[in-house]
């Protein structure tokens, strides 16, 4: 604290000894007086003990600092108030308390009676910025600048705008109150809510429609319009005492007798827990469904699959031989690998080894041919296989073809039709008539496909390169001897479709000179006379 006191006195001495002082002799006397006071104080401190000296020094130092702070406040206030003119119109006191520029309280150190808490008036706020941020830095001439005077238009109507409430036409009920929208909570609809609402709306619509129809019928019948239609009209019927299916046998359920005598749950009951499943019957269209074909493979892919299959079979065989399940096979010796397989034995006696190798090759060839002969089908087996294929084709679904041929006097044409029909196992008839010829085929899907191609593509019906049995002079004539112009011969497909059963038991040719003979024969064969009528009404222009 002594050090602080010395610094304070030194600063006072410097101030007193500054060149700005007006009276230098007085300053020298002041210095001498202060030096004398300092020496006396030091002498007094030397006589005081150290503990008391520290306490007195602290108290004296605190008092000196407070005095110095108060002096600085007074000087600052005087200097600040000297630059600002005292004008009541520029500043005004704030009755609410001291506030800063940003509505922040002034530091307690600066709160003094000499510092005025001021706030800018609205007039000054227009021409200057906020005092808190910019007013402190304004110079004196800016603060003293008078407000700008705006010239008013003398022709401008300065009368105050009338209030809406003062109008005689104002209705206070039209005043809208400010409506605030309240917050809404998140609401999740339950599952099936709107479905139930839609069903309820449909039921209500049906009920309204029912009411309208009942009202319309009652009006037509002359019933009063006040007919009450309630929910009872569409309600459930009451449960009868006995079901309608039991009425022909009993009149009341009490006629059954004692329940203990019933043969329903006992061992003699014909009712059990077994379920009878009927035999499934495929529909007709299921038989003609095209079979699913495997994916088509290229030649390279086929070779790869064959190679992999053979490698797997060879690997399995080698595994069985290693496990001792099968005996190992002797080496397959050929003339090309003779030296590689036999080695030293082939070098010792090449002639003998070559003869043995040729013998093994011949044995392998004979064994291969014998196995092929064993796998080959006998003539009876081939015939049985052909019949089985035909039956399988027919079992998949029967189809029918009806052709109308203009001329059929050429024998090779009849021969091709007859042979192909028998080979494919088709049933039907070929009716020869002077007007036109009718051919009917009944067979499976595959056979029908081949016969259709035969009749429409393979046979040239205008070809007469070979003579016919009934030809005369290399000319084709009909049964009555009339010459035929085969260049006009045609073959048309009249009808094609599926049939449920065969109408003919076998394939045959039938000569019918008249139309009645053809119709009567077809009627005898299962009612196929409609084919004749269909072919007769056929027109090539259609």
Swiss-Prot record:
The keyword Nucleus appears for this protein: yes
A Pfam family matched in the record: Prp3_C
Keywords, in A-Z order: Cytoplasm, Cytoskeleton, mRNA processing, mRNA splicing, mRNA transport, Nucleus, Spliceosome, Transport
GO cellular component: cytoplasm; mitotic spindle; nucleus; spindle pole; spliceosomal complex; U4/U6 x U5 tri-snRNP complex
Subcellular location: Nucleus; Cytoplasm, Cytoskeleton, Spindle; Cytoplasm, Cytoskeleton, Spindle pole
GO biological process, one term: mRNA cis splicing, via spliceosome
Feature: compositional bias, Basic and acidic residues: 309-320
Bias-annotated ranges (Low complexity): 10-22
Region span, Disordered: 1-32, 151-191, 290-329, 367-388
InterPro entries: Pre-mRNA_splic_Prp3_dom, Prp3, Prp3_C
Domain of life (superkingdom): Eukaryota
Quaternary data: Component of the U4/U5/U6 tri-snRNP complex.
Function: Participates in pre-mRNA splicing and in nuclear mRNA export. May play a role in the assembly of the U4/U5/U6 tri-snRNP complex.
Protein name per its UniProtKB record: U4/U5/U6 small nuclear ribonucleoprotein prp3
Organism, as annotated: Schizosaccharomyces pombe (strain 972 / ATCC 24843) (Fission yeast)
Gene: prp3
